[in-house]
Curated annotation (Swiss-Prot):
Protein name: Phosphomethylpyrimidine synthase
GO molecular function: 4 iron, 4 sulfur cluster binding; carbon-carbon lyase activity; zinc ion binding
Pfam families: ThiC-associated, ThiC_Rad_SAM
Keywords, alphabetical: 4Fe-4S, Iron, Iron-sulfur, Lyase, Metal-binding, S-adenosyl-L-methionine, Thiamine biosynthesis, Zinc
Catalytic activity: 5-amino-1-(5-phospho-beta-D-ribosyl)imidazole + S-adenosyl-L-methionine = 4-amino-2-methyl-5-(phosphooxymethyl)pyrimidine + CO + 5'-deoxyadenosine + formate + L-methionine + 3 H(+)
Any GO CC annotation of this UniProt entry: cytosol
Annotated residues for binding of [4Fe-4S] cluster: 581, 584, 589
Gene this chain is encoded by: thiC
Protein role: Catalyzes the synthesis of the hydroxymethylpyrimidine phosphate (HMP-P) moiety of thiamine from aminoimidazole ribotide (AIR) in a radical S-adenosyl-L-methionine (SAM)-dependent reaction.
The EC number(s) this enzyme carries: 4.1.99.17
Keyword Nuclease carried by entry: no
Binding residue positions for Zn(2+): 437, 501
This protein's pathway: Cofactor biosynthesis; thiamine diphosphate biosynthesis
Highest rank taxon of the organism: Bacteria
Length: 631
């Protein structure tokens, strides 16, 4: 029975079983490795794909082989990707960054929660069965101190987080020796700076300049440091979250773990249903990647879903609640200004951003300026105390290609640039959110406008979708736009699943969206010329040409699907060593023919060389030894 046909009770039971039986799992023929740094505790996880040797000659009885190097790849799965680590979702993950945070001596534990809502939830005994058992004692900055990675970077301090990131971004490529694997085409970077080797100092400099962010709330010590910036690998975000009509805490934790397994660099919890607070605590305590939220969603729940009843006080309380739980970045729709709302009147699809529409409705009902804009400096003060990064939301993004690149969209973008400078005054890290629905010929302007007006802060886009005709396939329509804008300089891509515009994604939808977007991000890295990006492609091509089927499966982004498709027509074990596949068969395989041509050419060259030497020998009179003057 498919997931969509299961009853709600069955879905929850299945998710609970997943959580209860969860253990570290490696991909086929892969092993977890760790690269260490100079800072204490800097131990960077990577996945190393083991490859089989290449047959280069010999006889059937005594074949000769040449070893193929293992391929290290970036790994977002955290402890879930290490079979040696015991996983217990009830206890949460190890607090990797806690010693680094404590060693800086600029934070203090809170004896009382700052959020009234949090206090009320903790006092409610009826929530005990839902509550995560090991609730973290939150920290905040000491009086007069700032604890953001941007602050440290501006002070010239290289933090352990920065060293961790430098090692991670290099992807272990210094381990690769083969010239065949290291070969890479020159890229076109559109002004991005892509050093051959990423150092901790380079990371520090990019963060200090505001060109990159490290989302790392001091209350989320379980997270493994990562970076978002156009001079680094293109990252992918996955959205999860329950709603008022579907999903549960168990299912959201399952989606979190599933997302990190398939390559999510960050995860946004967009929950809008009951138990938002409790769901988020479970997610944070079990997440090895940064977690983002849209706080206005929960603030709206607190006023019973009535946008007109929203207040700054309710929103501020929500920020404090989430910051002290450990949320790493907030999407804030502070650029939806009252004067911009009429600009959307002529649009085909109006305002499609949920947060944008909430704030537009509030502005119109009160005929006042957006309170997020009015109180933006106070928002920055809160973020600076916990190192919460700001993701400035595009509440006026286009919801159809007809509305792309219009006056409202770019008016808001320019305001986001103004807000970026204000956030930087408080040493708060910032990225900018972008569209949306944009046809291919109009995509690059989005990147150039953002770089110019938002001062090179990292860009983070939803797609964009390049056509509106394919519900059910919008992971594909948006993947095209995502690859393009990633090439042009977008730092992080928010995935779109096949369920976009149709319903809440399930576990399989999450996987499909992530695989699509990992392809888009990798294609962008290749096009930019990111050092080492082509190594895995070269390894795959070599395995393909040498008919090493197992290696082809294991080098794939999704080894299980690759193997399943192959085995649909050649399921026998002999098919794993055959020098053909079912597409062309044994007589028409182009690569087999190419190998035969290459072997024939090599044989012909040898035979021609021998013939030339024989003729030369006869021309010299058949003497075995030559006189010195003839030699």
């Amino acid at each position: 029975m498919s997931a969509t046909k299961l009853t709600r009770r069955e879905q929850r039971a299945r998710a609970q079983h997943f959580i209860d039986t969860l253990e570290g799992t490696a991909f086929p023929n892969s092993k977890r490795i760790y690269l260490t740094g100079t800072h204490s505790g800097v131990r960077v996880p990577m996945r190393e794909i083991q490859l089989s040797p290449t047959l280069i000659g010999g006889s059937k009885e005594q074949p000769q082989f040449e070893e193929n190097e293992a391929i290290p790849v970036y790994d977002t799965s955290g402890p879930y990707g290490d079979p040696q680590i015991a996983i217990n979702v009830q206890q949460g993950l190890a607090k990797l960054r806690q010693p680094w945070i404590d060693a800086r001596g600029d934070t203090e534990e809170l004896t009382v929660r700052s959020s009234d809502y949090t206090k009320a939830r903790l006092a409610d005994d009826g929530l005990d069965e839902l509550r995560f058992s090991g609730v973290l004692t939150p920290k905040r900055a000491k009086a007069g101190r700032r604890v953001t990675q941007l602050h440290y970077a501006r002070q010239g301090i290289i933090t352990p987080e920065m060293e961790f990131i430098a090692i991670r971004e290099n992807m272990g490529r210094e381990r690769i020796r083969s010239e065949v694997l290291r070969h890479q085409h020159p890229g076109m970077s559109f002004g991005a700076r892509l050093p051959e080797n990423i150092t901790a100092e380079f990371v520090r400099d990019e963060v200090a300049a505001g060109r990159a962010i490290i989302p790392a709330n001091i209350n989320h010590p379980e997270s493994e440091p990562m970076i978002i910036g156009r001079n680094f690998l293109v990252k992918v975000n996955a959205n999860i979250g329950n709603s008022a009509v579907t999903s549960s805490i168990e299912e959201e934790v399952e989606k979190l773990v599933w997302s990190t397994r398939w390559g999510a660099d960050t995860v946004m919890d967009l929950s809008t249903g009951r138990y938002i607070h409790e769901t988020r605590e479970w997610i944070l305590r079990n997440s090895p990647v940064p977690i983002g939220t849209v706080p206005i969603y929960q603030a709206l729940e607190k006023v019973n879903g009535i946008a007109e009843d929203l207040t700054w006080e309710a929103f501020r309380d929500t920020l404090l609640e989430q910051a002290e739980q450990g949320v790493d970045y907030f999407t804030i729709h502070a650029g939806v200004l009252l004067r911009y709302v009429p600009m959307t009147a002529k649009r085909l699809t109006g305002i499609v951003s949920r947060g944008g529409s909430i704030m537009a409705k509030w502005c119109l009902s009160h005929h006042q300026e957006n309170f997020l804009y009015q109180h933006f400096r106070e928002i920055c003060e809160i973020c600076a105390a916990y190192d919460v990064s700001l993701s400035l939301g595009d509440g006026l993004r286009p919801g159809s290609i007809q509305d792309a690149n219009d006056e409202a969209q770019f008016a808001e973008l320019h305001t986001l640039g103004e807000l970026t400078k204000i956030a930087w005054e408080y040493d708060v890290q910032v990225m900018i959110e972008g569209p949306g629905h944009v046809p291919m010929q109009m995509i690059r302007r989005n990147m150039t406008e953002e770089l110019e007006h938002c001062h090179e802060a990292p860009f983070y886009t939803l797609g964009p979708l390049t056509t509106d005709i394919a519900p059910g396939y919008d992971h594909f329509t948006s993947g095209i736009g995502a690859a393009m804008i990633g090439w042009f300089g977008c730092a992080m891509l928010c995935y779109v699943t096949p369920k976009e515009h149709l319903g809440l994604p399930n576990k399989e939808d999450v996987k499909q969206g992530l695989i699509t977007y990992k392809i888009a991000a990798h294609a962008a890295d290749l096009a930019k010329g990111h050092p080492g990006a082509q190594i895995r492609d070269n390894a795959m091509s070599k395995a393909r040409f040498e008919f090493r089927w197992e290696d082809q499966f294991n080098l794939a982004l999704d080894p299980f699907t690759a193997r399943a498709y192959h085995d649909e027509t050649l399921p026998q074990e002999s098919g794993k060593v055959a020098h053909f596949c079912s597409m062309c068969g044994p007589k028409f395989c182009s690569m087999k023919i190419s190998q035969e041509v290459r072997d024939y050419a090599a044989t012909q060259t040898i035979e021609m060389g021998m013939a030339d030497m024989s003729e030369n020998f006869r021309a010299r009179g058949g003497e075995i030894y030559l006189r010195k003057e003839e030699a």
